[in-house]
A protein has these predicted regions:
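Post-signal peptide N-terminal segment of mature Sec-exported envelope proteins
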Residues: 38-52
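Conserved phosphoacceptor histidine of two-component systems
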Residues: 178
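C-terminal motif of bacterial Sec signal peptides marking the signal peptidase cleavage site
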Residues: 27-29
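Fold-level signature of zinc-dependent metallopeptidase catalytic domains
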Residues: 50-68
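Metalloprotease/metallohydrolase-associated module, dominated by Zn2+-dependent proteases
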Residues: 142-171, 187-228
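Bacterial lipoprotein signal-peptidase II cleavage site
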Residues: 31-37
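Metzincin-family zinc-dependent endopeptidase catalytic domain
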Residues: 67-175, 183, 187
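Bacterial N-terminal signal peptides that target proteins for export
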Residues: 4-19
Length: 228
């Protein structure tokens, strides 16, 4: 009986140890599976996160544009974009000249710049000093400071209507950054009177602008702009 009892105890112990071993294997397997699952999730997330393409702005000076102002503006743009390339001085195209008002059609200047575009994700902008105009605000030929079409990637700006456009002029930089904002898909901003994307509506308001509002800023940061 004693031998039989001991035998039974040994059998129970063997079964118990076997069950522990199985449980341990299951825990290890579960842990490995969980670890592998987490690793796969991280890999999937990394695949989804795509860094914005390098943002390059190509700057052209139309004949007669102030060199000092242009260089200072390019220096400021360097803090916002990955790369800013000065592409040289170019003549005003005859096709853009509007003789009745002795000025240039902005849309035709932009079309001229568009033909010079370097890359599909790059931005092109022309700095002009002569008066420019466009069909806006119910007028066929309305004098403006800058022009582009939303997401066109190409713009033109002029110092003709910018007050005190000297080498250190901050208003001209605000004008440039406003038009480049349009090239990246931003409409005129109604959230803040101090946002760079506020609509001038035919008035001079550049001195009132201080920064992009949070909404406009978030939009541009997603597109690779370096904004604080």
């Amino acid at each position: 009986m004693i031998n039989e009892s001991m035998s039974m105890r040994n059998s129970v112990k063997a079964i118990w140890w076997a069950m522990l071993a199985v449980c341990a294997c299951m825990v290890c397997a579960c842990g490995n599976a969980t670890e592998q699952s987490h690793t796969e999730q991280v890999k999937q997330h990394q695949k989804k996160v795509v860094a914005p393409k390098k943002k390059t702005v190509h700057v052209y000076f139309f004949d007669g544009f102030k060199d000092a102002l242009g260089k200072n503006t390019i220096k400021e743009l360097d803090e916002v974009f990955d790369s800013v390339e000065f592409e040289g001085v170019i003549p005003y195209p005859d096709s853009a000249y509007y003789a009745p008002r002795n000025r240039y059609k902005a849309d035709k200047l932009v079309r001229h710049l568009k033909a010079l575009q370097k890359g599909t994700s790059d931005l092109e902008i022309g700095f002009a000093s002569k008066d420019i105009s466009a069909a806006v605000h119910g007028h066929d030929d309305f004098g403006i400071m800058g022009w582009t079409r939303i997401s066109l990637k190409t713009a033109v700006v002029s110092t003709f209507r910018v007050k005190g456009a000297n080498a250190q002029n901050r208003d001209f930089f605000k004008l440039v950054i406003h038009e480049l904002g349009h090239t990246e898909g931003l409409q005129h901003c109604k959230n803040s009177r101090t946002c760079y994307m506020r609509d001038a509506k035919g008035t001079y308001h550049l001195h009132e602008l201080t920064d992009f509002c949070p909404t406009c800023k978030a939009h541009l940061i997603k597109r690779g702009w370096h904004l604080r």
